Amino acid sequence: MNTPMFTRTSSLERTLETNKVLKNTYFLLSMTLVTSAIAAMATMAIGISPIVALVMQLAAIGILFFVMPKAINSSSGLVWTFVFTGLMGGALGPMLNFYAAMPNGPIVIAQALGLTGMVFLGLSAYTITSKKDFSFMRNFLFAGLIIVIVAALINIFVGSTVAHLAISSVSALVFSGFILFDTSRIVRGEETNYISATISMYLNILNLFTSLLSILGIMNNND
């Protein structure tokens, strides 16, 4: 039978461990975002082709699925995390150059960055302070993700601007939901590996940014 003192001690230890994971996650996340930004600016300046960007994305996906599962619990996991986020950031070069060349393009990019930051900070702060359990969203989010991927693949051949806007809007909602879900997992002690947590949150932010950029880009073209 657990004594009150033992229960309080265990609760304190869990809280300290959770706070440590949160602190390490957000510190590493900030470093990976800086790495991605530098890589993106470099590939924008170089002017890499979409084919090169695709190769970089495929290499990053390979690291995510085949390297990270083995390295995530070791110090090499940190190295691979920066390689992964560097490749993902660098792959944004052609897309960012495309939007930058549009009328008011730099403003659109800045707006997308600002909105992404506001959404992420707002949702994270709400989840951390409320400690609400968002695990109930899991099935809805993964179903939404599958729908977004399938719809995006179909629209490659259809080429509908309206469909693109709808897909980007749903995608923004889905990845906002994933921010709530993943933050909740850390707060509730379900995610204890800060490298894994960082990668999940990084992908949420990246996809939220690209979704918002698409939405703002389409709206800017219609003005």
From Swiss-Prot:
Read off the CDD domains from this record: YccA_like
* A single MF term (Gene Ontology): calcium channel activity
What membrane topology does the UniProt entry give?
Multi-pass membrane protein
Residues making up the signal peptide according to the UniProt record: none
Q: Which UniProt keywords apply?
A: Cell membrane, Membrane, Transmembrane, Transmembrane helix
Mind listing the GO biological process terms from this record?
regulation of proteolysis
Its GO CC terms? plasma membrane
**What Pfam family is a match, any one?**
Bax1-I
Mark the transmembrane ranges. Answer: 25-45, 46-66, 78-98, 105-125, 140-160, 161-181, 199-219
Q: Where in the cell is it found?
A: Cell membrane
Query: From which domain of life does this come?
Result: Bacteria
Q: Which family does it belong to?
A: Belongs to the BI1 family.
**Matching PANTHER family:** BAX INHIBITOR-RELATED, MODULATOR OF FTSH PROTEASE YCCA
Annotated protein name in UniProt: Uncharacterized membrane protein VC_1358
What are the leading ranks of the lineage?
A: Bacteria, Pseudomonadati, Pseudomonadota, Gammaproteobacteria, Vibrionales
